[in-house]
Amino acid sequence: MHPISSASIESLPNELLLPILEACAVPSLFSVCKRWHHLLGSEVMPSLYKQIGKVHVSQGDINKQAFILDRIYKLDDRLSEGEKAKAIFKEAFTLAKSLAPAELEFKWKTQEKRCFTLANYASYLLNINRLLLWKKLPGRGEYLNQEKIKYLPLEKQGELLRGWIEENCKNITILDLSGVGLTYLPPEICQVSQLQELNSSQNQLTSLPTEIGQLSELQDLSLNQNQLTSLPVEIGQLSQLQTLELNRNQLTSLPIEIGQLSQLQDLFLNQNQLTSLPIEIGQLSQLQTLDLNQNQLTSLPTEIGQLSRLRVLCLNQNQLTSLPAEIGRLSQLQVLYLNQNQLTALPTEIGQLSQLRTLSLNQNQLTHLPVEIGQLSQLQWLYLNQNQLTSLPIEIGQLSQLQELYLSQNQLTSLPIEIGQLSQLRTLSLNQNQLTHLLAEIGQLSQLQWLYLNQNQLTSLPAEIGQLSQLQWLYLNQNQLTSLPGEIGKMSRLRRLNLNQNQLTNLPAEIGQLSELQWLYLNQNQLTSLPGEIGQLSQLIILKLAENPLKDIAEKIRQRFQL
């Protein structure tokens, strides 16, 4: 027999394909199938691999289909398409045999045409998924273990599912199908008509049946960690849906019918491939949480401003270059995450977010902040690390509830004196800027506990720093300090003091008053001696003095720290 070079898989007679499939599923049968072995290296198997990909992902290019198929079956990229097809067969047969052993003992009779071909691949896969679903339904064990049932072929068992659900599952309200190996959701799921919560996360779903829209009582639908490339328009029929979780899928767009989910409160879409949102997103009048982290959004529709109940909006790790002015209409918004985008400015309307408590803008390209930022009267956490800010507006001092302010890795050369008005501030991070001095007003931050000033260009500290009576951590490493003010000894709560890589030639005796100090870092300075008062630091655990020209260390200190 000559190798096949162009015949489609569907047209292969069962007599020809059967030995190939048997050989793939049961390697020991290779010995009796040598006469067919040449087919395994022909165009048959690679062609079958491509067509199986179309079964799972009907739309999209070949590369997308192959990518999804490889993820479903966890195939090694280094395998050829023919080898991948064989691996798919083997896994499918193994699973099918575990579900309905009588169906796949490989005692096939050619004349009965009982063969696993591409023509019936979709229906065969459906019956595997039917049995996977069935095994998660309560009360199924006794029925499936009946002699007359368990020896039926897989297809015959699968055909019984609908009737069994109609008879036994009317009152099921919660169904957990997570991590059971589903490659698609059997349409019989719609027969569980009272279902309120459905969890089908951590499977290999590439699509949802249109029948999903018939679950009229469904309130929570969790589909995280699948391979979904699209949603059916029927999703909009879930009129009672309150929570929809679609994290970690392959979605590139949302159907406009998403706007029909009038009761939806929480929508999770992080780690997909969305490039835009439909304008109908603005119709979700009850939405409180919208998570779009780690997508490919380049802009937001102006209709986003219609989400009048929205409290949490997560947009980290997208490609946003600007925000629409309408974002200021989100009057109930409390949390706004915009880290790792490409924002160069914020709209002035940002100041209208009167309920905002957390604003995170790390790793953008902001060069300035609008003065309206001072209107955020409820703001408690403001994150601006890794931007290009050269100054702060004086209105920053109006943030009377601010507790944490992060400004590391910017280009700040000074701070406005209004910074001292932040009476609730507990954390101030200014490391890796270009500060040459600190204002005396820094001492007004009476609640400050953590102050990070490392990697700046400070040559001195104001005496007012001693007024920071609640300060616990003070990082000043990698500056140009030559001395410390004696007032540093007044920081009675200080536990960590990092002064590595400065130009200190001496320490004030008042350092011995830091009664709670535990860590003192003084590496790479110009110290020639230490004040004896260091010996009074009864809580000190770590003292680092490397790379100093020390000549005189009190014996008590030397013994205590094994110097």
What are these regions (language model features)?
Residues 175-177, 198-200, 221-223, 244-246, ...:
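Conserved hydrophobic beta-strand positions in leucine-rich repeat
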Residues 168-169, 191-194, 213-217, 236-240, ...:
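Leucine-rich repeat
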Residues 530-563:
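Leucine-rich solenoid repeat scaffolds
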